[in-house]
Curated annotation (Swiss-Prot):
Molecular-function annotations in GO: guanyl-nucleotide exchange factor activity
Name the record gives this protein: Rho guanine nucleotide exchange factor 9
Tissue: Detected in brain, throughout the gray matter. Detected at low levels in heart and skeletal muscle.
Coiled coil (UniProt feature): none
Region (Disordered), start-end ranges: 453-473
Ranges where the PH domain occurs: 325-432
Region entry Interaction with GPHN, spans: 107-117
Subunit-level organization: Interacts with GPHN.
Cytoplasm listed as a keyword: yes
Gene this protein is translated from: Arhgef9
Location of the DH domain: 110-294
CDD domains (UniProt xref): PH_Collybistin_ASEF, RhoGEF, SH3_ARHGEF9
Summary of the function given for this chain in its UniProt record: Acts as a guanine nucleotide exchange factor (GEF) for CDC42. Promotes formation of GPHN clusters.
Length: 493
């Protein structure tokens, strides 16, 4: 069988088409280049050049950097119909060499391939983190004339914490790795032991958008372009822009469930590692799901700021000072114990607080701020239909909020039982969200709050300008109509 050495020390059979996954985004303006995004699958058609491969994605073919992709470990899923079919691979984690031969049906060999890939990618990832911390961050700290502490915090987030965590994680992986028989390695327990540590990725992922915006502003100055490029060359890093390196942790945390799912696929149920890998897969799926959910919440904070700006007579702190998610909203009757009057209000339940609003009597789409309830101080009490002696009212579809410190009580009446059930479910969801946020230290940064406020101000100005233009246009139109009536032929002035 003929072997051709490809990029990154990989060996590929000369008559084979293999599949590779993009590790980095590749943007190209070249006529014969092929562009792709991280996660895309590329068919490698020619790997005879060490640095540049020829490949196909969808219907497009072209050249791309070999260092931007990784070959699939187990390529046996390809259909065996000829010499150009996808071949099976084996990756030696010590030499980083992927050898592609004939398909093997041996489950142990397949498991060894996945184990070896996990070990190899972890070692490469550690190097990327080291390059970021020592090649970029360390050099930036030396240039106080170019970077403030706040800027570096925004750009790099908690990358050093991630680096320290990953070094400890990889050390434990190495202890679990069986060099002689990789398929016997038991790495599932390692993920379970470190599961709480992976939550530090949440802070990094939540900050990543701010990092990109800050870098984008700096890169408008050629000094920063030259500085970051000099850092890359000095550290002997691959030809990727700094924003590409900073994206790596975001990509990495999302890859763990995929790798563990593949490992579980090739782990026999009687293998000593099976139940641990299955548990690790569930844990890492939950971690990535929660991180993605929190990232989505941060992307929606502009909407919360815009909503608050639309509420008239607002008092007190901004919603974003404590909350980041609207959980439920609805209209209910409400009685507050000291007054005992039944009032109709619109309630907006956020994490940590519930805002009370009153609709305008004429313009029902206009809301007036009427107060808020600190959900951290209250407990929810489900009430059966009947008479309440404390409030001296008949109750149906009711529940109470009881202040555990002051003994204050709020009584609520939903219009229907189904609505009451939805509210009770929403309160449980609110408490669960708060507990999970506290566990991983989730919060909105001051920079993100400022950004949301700026977005609202910008939108208000644009709306104001549009309104003025519409009014001016309407006045001009009316003036023209008047003039036309005054000076039309056959009519006296």
């Amino acid at each position: 069988m003929q072997w051709i050495r490809g990029g990154s020390g990989m060996l590929i059979t000369g008559d084979s088409i293999v599949s590779a996954e993009a590790v980095w985004d590749h943007v190209t303006m070249a006529n014969r280049g092929v562009a792709f995004k991280a996660g895309d699958v590329i068919k490698v058609l020619d790997a005879s050049n060490k640095d540049w491969w020829w490949g196909q994605i969808d219907d497009e073919e072209g050249w791309f950097p070999a260092s931007f992709v990784r070959l699939w470990v187990n390529q046996e899923d390809g259909v065996e119909e000829g010499p150009s079919d996808v071949q099976n691979g084996h990756l030696d984690p010590n030499s980083d060499c992927l050898c592609l031969g004939r398909p093997l049906q041996n489950r142990d060999q397949m498991r060894a391939n996945v184990i070896n890939e996990i070990m190899s990618t972890e070692r490469h990832y550690i190097k990327h983190l080291k390059d970021i911390c020592e090649g970029y961050l360390k050099q930036c700290r030396k240039r106080r004339d170019m970077f403030s502490d706040e800027q570096l915090k925004v750009i790099f987030g908690n990358i050093e914490d991630i680096y320290r965590f990953q070094m400890g994680f990889v050390r434990d992986l190495e202890k679990q790795y069986n060099n002689d028989d990789p398929h016997l390695s038991e790495i599932g327990p390692c993920f379970l032991e470190h599961q709480d540590g992976f939550w530090i990725y949440s802070e990094y992922c939540n900050n990543h958008l701010d990092a990109c915006m800050e870098l984008s502003k700096l890169m408008k100055d050629s000094r920063y372009q030259h500085f970051f490029e000099a850092c890359r060359l000095l550290q002997q890093m691959i030809d990727i822009a700094i924003d590409g390196f900073l994206l790596t942790p975001v990509q990495k945390i999302c890859k763990y469930p995929l790798q563990l799912a593949e490992l579980l696929k090739y782990t026999a149920q009687d293998h000593s590692d099976y139940r641990y890998v299955a548990a690790a897969l569930a844990v890492m799926r939950n971690v990535t799901q929660q991180i993605n959910e929190r990232k989505r919440r941060l992307e929606n904070i502009d909407k919360i700021a815009q909503w608050q700006a639309s509420v008239l007579d607002w008092e007190g702190d901004d919603i974003l000072d404590r909350s980041s998610e609207l959980i439920y909203t609805g209209e209910m009757a409400w009685i507050y114990q000291p007054y005992g009057r039944n009032q109709q209000r619109v309630f907006f339940l956020f994490d940590h607080q519930m805002v009370l609003c009153k609709k305008d009597l004429i313009r029902r789409d206009i809301l007036y701020y009427k107060g808020r309830i600190d959900m951290d101080k209250y407990e929810v009490i489900d009430i059966e239909d009947g008479r309440d002696d404390d409030f001296n009212v008949s109750m149906k579809n009711a529940f109470k909020l009881h202040n555990k410190e002051t003994e204050e009580v709020h009584l609520f009446f939903a219009k229907k039982l189904e609505e009451k059930i939805r509210w009770l479910r929403a309160f449980r969801e609110e408490r669960k969200m708060v507990q999970e946020d506290e566990k991983i230290g989730f919060e909105i940064s001051e920079n993100q709050k400022r950004q949301a406020a700026m977005t609202v101000r910008k939108a208000s100005k644009q709306k104001g300008r549009v309104g003025e233009e519409e009014n001016q246009s309407l006045e001009l139109k009316r003036a023209c109509e008047v003039l036309q009536r005054l000076w039309s032929p056959g009519k006296k002035s």
